[in-house]
UniProtKB/Swiss-Prot annotation:
This is UPF0301 protein CHU_1773. PANTHER family: UNCHARACTERIZED PROTEIN YQGE, UPF0301 PROTEIN YQGE. GO terms for cellular component: cytosol. Pfam families: DUF179 (PF02622). HAMAP family: UPF0301. Belongs to the UPF0301 (AlgH) family. InterPro entries: AlgH-like. It comes from Cytophaga hutchinsonii (strain ATCC 33406 / DSM 1761 / CIP 103989 / NBRC 15051 / NCIMB 9469 / D465).
Length: 182
């Protein structure tokens, strides 16, 4: 069932290079559509390379999706809503909020940088678009905890999540990117 906090795992034969082997955290789903962030698409860009002001901290950015790639978004893990205007997703997971307050919390050490992930862009679907893609078997819906979202090696997340699901999903985790090359 599609609800915020679920992940969407792209089928290995999706045929869309943007979402190839992606794991998308669903941050919102309603009658108007859905949006989320790709958790496993890191970039070589850093937060200070895209902001006009230089921050006192540095972190690599992730590609959140193909929409609004000139905008910065963020996810964070926090025991309670300490960041102003952050939106609760599930458990200890939130997205967005007051960026100035976020910078202060990180500088004070109230919020650890390891509990933040910054994204350029987001993944978005219009009304019924995601449901249509699910009918076409483009995505697998699964659960994930926030600890597994903030792994040090996100590039292997797609394969690791499928493998941990077992059964046929474990077999899918070994599906080649281009089976014609086998």
């Amino acid at each position: 069932m599609l609800t915020k906090g679920k992940i969407l795992i792209s089928e290995p034969y999706l045929g869309d290079s943007t979402f190839e082997r992606s794991v998308v955290l669903l941050c919102e789903h309603n009658d108007s559509g859905a949006f989320g962030f790709m958790l496993n698409k890191s970039t070589t860009l850093t937060i200070n390379s895209v902001l006009e002001e230089q921050l006192t901290f540095e972190q690599n950015l992730f590609l959140g999706g193909p929409v609004a790639q000139d905008s910065l978004f963020f996810l964070l893990r926090q025991d309670r809503a300490i960041l102003k205007d952050s939106v609760h997703i599930k458990d200890d997971l939130y997205w967005g909020g007051d960026f100035e307050h976020l910078k202060t919390l990180i500088q004070e050490g109230t919020l650890e940088l390891d509990n933040c992930r910054f994204f350029l862009g987001y993944s978005g679907w219009g009304e019924d678009q995601l449901e249509y893609e699910l009918e076409k078997h483009s995505w697998i819906i699964a659960d994930i905890n926030s600890e597994d979202m903030f792994v040090k090696n996100p590039e292997s997340m797609w394969q690791n999540v499928l493998r941990s699901m077992g059964g046929d999903y474990k077999v899918l985790s070994n599906y080649p990117i281009d089976p014609r090359l086998n």
